[in-house]
Amino acid sequence: SRFKCVIRAGVGLDNIDVQYAKDNGIEVKNTPKSPSESVAELAMAHMFSCARYISIAGHSMREGKWEKKAYGKGIELTGKTLGIVGFGRIGQKLGKMAKAIGMNVIAFDIFHIPGIEEELGIPYVEMDELLAKSDFISVHAPAVDGGALINAERIAKMKDGVVIINTSRGTNVDEAALLDALNSGKVRAAGLDVYADEPATNVALYSHPMVSCTPHIGSATVEAQGRIGEELVEIISKM
């Protein structure tokens, strides 16, 4: 066969049958470096949105309302603790941004990168410690087998009023457990760019007033798409 390689313009390989490709001698590659800045910035944007009611307040105004008192109890990010689950390129970018605005940052990853704690001033901690200490939790791990990383059991270990951000893979967060926690107030708000089903079908979740949502646009910037194109050319030129 002349079919030698599949290149995914982005990070995730969810829409590629990797095992089939491997069995048939077809290489599968992606462009993991290119979208990091854009995805990290979107995660940060969702953090601000959740802290200050930006999404729901804007929607309210478009309905002709002026609900200043309803959205008068926002919170600052400065001084809060951000826990990053998955400390690869995107997690590291977000960690640097968060530290720059005065947040305390901790990280969990099953793989520890030598020297990165000292370089960034961001310590690795165990998952339970991250859950207990974090005011904001942002997920940047690849999809995992065996269930969601953020499930009902782990949400129960979080601070009351925690904010959860997911710009990684929709299956990393148990949507039913998240919705229950939003309704109970255990979770203050959630910022979501990815969903278990895409296009998203969980209307109750993405229409919740305390959910800041976007339709999987993490890498959808002019700059990221330009870098992805360059990375594609680089990969092809080395084949």
Q: Could you say what each language-model-derived stretch is?
A:
Residues G91-Q92:
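N-terminal Rossmann-fold NAD(P) dinucleotide-binding loop
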Residues F87-G88:
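Glycine-rich Rossmann-fold phosphate-binding loop(s) that bind the pyrophosphate
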Residues N24, P32-T81, K96:
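Phosphate-binding beta-alpha-beta segment of Rossmann-like dinucleotide-binding domains, i.e.
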Residues K22-D23, E27-L42, I56, E67, ...:
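C-terminal helix-to-coil terminal segments
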Residues R2-C5, N24-E27, M103, D160-V162, ...:
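A short helix->loop->beta-strand "cap" motif at the edges of active sites that frequently abuts
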Residues S1-K29, A132, N151-E153:
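An N-terminal-biased, well-structured beta-alpha scaffold segment characteristic
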Residues F3, T78-T81, A152, G161:
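Phosphate-coordination loops involved in phosphoryl transfer and adenosine-cofactor binding
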Residues I110-A204, A220:
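Rossmann-like adenosine-cofactor binding region
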